[in-house]
From Swiss-Prot:
Region listing for Disordered, in residue ranges: 340-362
GO molecular function terms attached to this record: rRNA binding; structural constituent of ribosome
Protein name: Large ribosomal subunit protein uL3
Similarity comment: family membership: Belongs to the universal ribosomal protein uL3 family.
Isomerase recorded as keyword: no
Domain of life: Archaea
Gene3D superfamilies: 3.30.1430.10, Ribosomal protein L3, domain 3, Translation factors
Organism: Pyrococcus horikoshii (strain ATCC 700860 / DSM 12428 / JCM 9974 / NBRC 100139 / OT-3)
Gene Ontology CC terms: cytosolic large ribosomal subunit
The protein's role, per its UniProt record: One of the primary rRNA binding proteins, it binds directly near the 3'-end of the 23S rRNA, where it nucleates assembly of the 50S subunit.
Subunit structure: Part of the 50S ribosomal subunit. Forms a cluster with proteins L14 and L24e.
Amino acid sequence: MGKIHRPRKGSLAFSPRKRAKSIVPRIRSWPKETEVRMLGFAGYKAGMTHILMIDDEPGLTNGKEIFMPVTIIETPPLRVFGIRAYRQGYLGLETAGEVIVPDFELDNYTPSKKGKGRKFTFYQFLGRRIATLPKDYTQEEFEQKLGALEDMIKEGEIVEVRALVSTQPWVIKLKKKPEVMEYAIGGTSVEEKFNYIKEKLGKEIRVGEVLKEGELLDVIAVTKGKGTQGPVKRWGIKLRAHKDSKGRRKVGSIGPWHPARVMWTVPMAGQMGFHHRTELNKRLIAIGENGKLVIDGNEIEITPKGGFPHYGIVRGDFMMIAGSVPGAIKRIIRVRPAIRPPKKKPPVQRPQITYVSVESKQ
């Protein structure tokens, strides 16, 4: 008789399979880098297309033209609006303080006909996400708080500083409410990380300033929601026999007589999708500007004929990432440099692209 080998259906590693707390994904771990840069970026998923490229990774197809499905993520510039400092606590890092920039007039928002002639400030949009923004917050108060934070760093009380950033979806005419998140900074000392954020406070950061074409990224997002699904779709259990009694898309047994209870490991119906997921080592194929990709000196519009379904036109900067990424169209997608890269890494440069499909995806 052959070896009986039947692993259980579905992974228990992601249990409980419940909805994510927030549609904005969290990054709990950061790679350690000596280069002083922001460790990641964020954008909005536009859709997928495919390209032909010369394979530059070691293997059988090296130097040959290969087909590659790619995901387009539109990345309007992020606005650095604050700095958060951490001290070492008994159970880990503790917030020691934070400083945000005072309000200022926006120069990248194009109002509708009703809003023509009006001035719009950054706090008007940030206030849609953060309800506790300070009122009558002056430049002097800002500089005073920043100086106090700098003194804490010199005294050695601070062990980590991170940048508070806001997305600017109004730049690409997607929506007005921004997403707010925190990004770690690469570097060897707290002082150089602090100086990097201090220089960027109140300014925009574009994706090309942070990430390099060809490098490996980890993609963090909330997956598409599927609602309540049965055990066959949710866990991948086997369909029961044709003449089985009392249902076909059910588990045959929910457990033994004893222990006299239903174990948590039994595949059951329930929530599927809208889960927080991280996918490792996705290659950043290319970075484009103004919705265009430059190939051999020629500008190619990345938007397919008729626009990306349910998204429309890519107007600003964008990332082209190899393969698929989790999340629905228009959903916020976060990336960071690969925290667990393979030993054989592809070269950190854009591969030679010979063709980009802009045929209709309708």
